[in-house]
Amino acid sequence: MEGSRRRRGDGCTIVQCYTPRRFVGRWLSGLRSSKGKRDAGEEQEDDTRRYQLAPIRCSTSLNQLVMQDNKQNCRLNKSKEPETNTFESQSRESPLEVGIGSFLLYLVVASKTELDKMTNLRMQMEMFLLNAKEQLQKKDTPMSSNEASGFQFSPQEFSNLASSIFQESSSSVLQEEYTEFEVSEPEDYRRGTDCNSKLQAEVGRLPLGEKAEDRQTKHQIQRQCKLKDNEVTKSHIPEMVVSDERYGVCPYELDKKLHELLETRQQEELVKLETALNRVERRLQEKETEVSWWKDAARLLAQRVPESSRSGLEWCNPDSSTCSERSVPRSYEACSIHRTSFSR
């Protein structure tokens, strides 16, 4: 409830707003003034009706009547004074009561709005707490399941862990065995070195055309020796078998199976290498027999050729470091430095 009053100043209008208390006070004062005027008019009418003058009969009676009227007026004034005092006190107290009532109404409305806000905040907080509890329960359920099961792992995780542990253990054991093998140098290792040296010597004796094949065989033989060394090292590895009832295969059993597979493959490769070695040995024997045949043929020819024809030839001694080349008949050829051979 608001009222306004306009005032005109220097070419502009100024609007003055009243407070609710002032507006209610002015409204109540207007009502009181109109009510007071009505009451005063009614009292005057009553007085005129009560105190109408009687017809004048004589002078003495007039004086008496005037005295009586004055007395009655004094009495009436005395009786009206407390009534006016009570009315003024009531008129002063009524705007205060109205203002207090309006203020109380305003407080009630404001408190209601605040209570509504508080209820909304309470509902929001309850929803937030419920969501937080649900999230915490969801996070705690996998941890509780792991604790209840005694930290059980899934099969995939266990297989990954087993493979990693197996690799680490196998690498450490192999390193230890290799170090022991290098320090001890068993007889198998020495035999392998002897084989390599013999093969190198035989390959040096072969002619130039067959050196490519001999290189391949040499490479295969070296691989064979390495595989034998690996077999020796694997024979020293301790076989440890640990049975696990929860899961299917133990890592040590897997290690054993892998070693068996490797051994079978290595044996197959060894068989192939042995066959290749046998072929090379056969070829070497054939070449040696051919060389011996050529030597025998040369001796026979030397015995049968007359001395006059042998004068033009100078034989190359295999023990001598140098060999002189001279004119040789077309049907014969001199050999290289280290051995002699003739071809027709």
UniProtKB/Swiss-Prot annotation:
Changing T340A: Reduced ASK7-mediated phosphorylation, enhanced stabilization at the plasma membrane and increased cell division. The modification Phosphoserine is found at S79, S91, S94, S235, S308, S309, S320, S321, S336. Changing S145A: Reduced ASK7-mediated phosphorylation, enhanced stabilization at the plasma membrane and increased cell division. Expressed in stomatal lineage cells with asymmetric division potential. InterPro entries: POLAR-like. GO terms for biological process: asymmetric cell division. Changing T86A: Reduced ASK7-mediated phosphorylation, enhanced stabilization at the plasma membrane and increased cell division. Changing S336A: Reduced ASK7-mediated phosphorylation, enhanced stabilization at the plasma membrane and increased cell division. It is found in: Cytoplasm; Cytoplasm, Cell cortex. One of its GO terms (cellular component) is cell cortex. Phosphorylation by ASK7/BIN2 is increases turnover. Keywords: Coiled coil, Cytoplasm, Phosphoprotein. Changing S159A: Reduced ASK7-mediated phosphorylation, enhanced stabilization at the plasma membrane and increased cell division. Residues 262-297 form a coiled coil. The modification Phosphothreonine is found at T19, T84, T86, T193, T217, T233. Disruption phenotype: No visible effect. Decreased accumulation of ASK7/BIN2 at the plasma membrane and impaired polarization of ASK7/BIN2 in asymmetric cell division (ACD) precursors thus leading to its nuclear localization in the meristemoids. Changing S94A: Reduced ASK7-mediated phosphorylation, enhanced stabilization at the plasma membrane and increased cell division. Changing S163A: Reduced ASK7-mediated phosphorylation, enhanced stabilization at the plasma membrane and increased cell division. PANTHER family: EMB|CAB62613.1, PROTEIN POLAR LOCALIZATION DURING ASYMMETRIC DIVISION AND REDISTRIBUTION. Component of a complex made of POLAR, BASL, ASK7/BIN2 and ASK3/SK12. Interacts with BASL, ASK7/BIN2 and ASK3/SK12. Regulates asymmetric cell division (ACD), especially in stomatal-lineage cells. Acts as a stomatal lineage scaffold which regulates subcellular localization and transient polarization of kinases (e.g. ASK7/BIN2 and ASK3/SK12) involved in ACD in a BASL-dependent manner. Promotes the differentiation of both pavement cells and stomata. This is Protein POLAR LOCALIZATION DURING ASYMMETRIC DIVISION AND REDISTRIBUTION. It comes from Arabidopsis thaliana (Mouse-ear cress). The lineage of its organism: Eukaryota, Viridiplantae, Streptophyta, Embryophyta, Tracheophyta.
